UniProtKB/Swiss-Prot annotation:
Record keywords, A-Z: ATP synthesis, CF(1), Hydrogen ion transport, Ion transport, Membrane, Thylakoid, Transport
Stored NCBIfam families: ATP_synt_epsi
GO CC annotations on file: plasma membrane-derived thylakoid membrane; proton-transporting ATP synthase complex
Keyword Membrane assigned: yes
Cross-referenced CDD domains: F1-ATPase_delta (cd12152)
Name of the protein: ATP synthase epsilon chain
Family affiliation: Belongs to the ATPase epsilon chain family.
Subcellular location: Cellular thylakoid membrane
Top-level taxon of origin: Bacteria
Quaternary structure note: F-type ATPases have 2 components, CF(1) - the catalytic core - and CF(0) - the membrane proton channel. CF(1) has five subunits: alpha(3), beta(3), gamma(1), delta(1), epsilon(1). CF(0) has three main subunits: a, b and c.
Recorded topology in the membrane: Peripheral membrane protein
GO molecular function, one term: ATP binding
Length: 134
């Protein structure tokens, strides 16, 4: 028995297909989904969705959104997403280093909008880098 998975971003159908297992990065932690899962709507954090089909894992970098789980169907609506195999690992790693370097100019206790944006860029770059490695 398989789960029907759709990952949708504005103007883009990122992924549509079956999966035996889905792991979602929710704002409260990872959610593992198997066939027959209880109904659930959850916020999706910046992170990596992992799906397993035929013993093969696929990663998708997600940039925040929502997911609806209904028995054997998962619909993920996100701001943007990229399939890991389509991300250049070297470019993703360089973007992560650049994002980490940008945060170093802020004092540790600062809570400015600029620092929050820089931290968000680190999260995005980390998600892309992690997804690119799988």
């Amino acid at each position: 028995m398989a789960i029907s998975l759709k990952v949708l971003a504005p103007n883009q159908n990122v992924y549509e297909g079956d999966a035996e297992e889905v792991i979602l990065p929710s704002t409260t932690g990872q959610i593992g989904v198997l066939p027959g899962h209880i109904s659930l709507v959850t916020a999706i954090d910046i992170g990596v969705l992992r799906l397993r089909m035929n013993s093969k894992w696929t990663s998708i970098a997600l940039m925040g959104g929502f997911a609806e789980i209904e028995s054997d169907e998962v619909i993920v609506l996100v701001n943007s997403a990229e399939i890991g195999s389509e991300i250049n690992t070297q470019n993703a790693e360089e973007a992560l280093k650049k994002a980490k370097s940008a945060i170093s100019k802020f004092p540790e206790n600062e809570k400015s909008p600029e620092k929050i944006k820089a931290l968000n860029e680190i999260s995005k770059a980390e998600a892309r880098f992690q997804a690119s490695k799988n």
